Amino acid sequence: MYSSASPIGAGASVVELAISFFTLNNKFSLLRSCWMEDLILRKLFQWSCKISLWRCSWESFEAEIAGLESQICVNESITSCLWPKIPSNCLSIFFSWPVCSELVVCANVEYLERSDSVCVSREMALPLMVTKDGCELMWCGCLSGIGLFPVSS
């Protein structure tokens, strides 16, 4: 006899179980998509950068979605990085970060006067990150994550 505390029992309807499965499967689909893009980008641009992979937990994204403006996350391989504001139509996101050394963070066009970076306002006026060794990190859309691209001179 099943107790009401059982994961699959009288307390959980078929609809609830289906919704839970769909939500979990959707998150893993996004994860696979980001991983594939990240692997391709890292292979293509491995010659130009010292790349390290960095992740924030799902909890960080949940906090962003809840309405926080920007969040500073710190990791051993990066001094700091600025999270752009997540668009309201993004519900659950997993980003992977291919990172070049000596990251310089630029928010829109506010730091155009900085001599050690090339800041350009892109689509949706989202932040652009540029490194001294010729790589930029840019926002590529709410499902595709962060991409690594060579900075044009």
From Swiss-Prot:
Domain of life: Eukaryota
Other remarks in the entry: Partially overlaps GOS1.
Designated name of the protein: Putative uncharacterized protein YHL030W-A
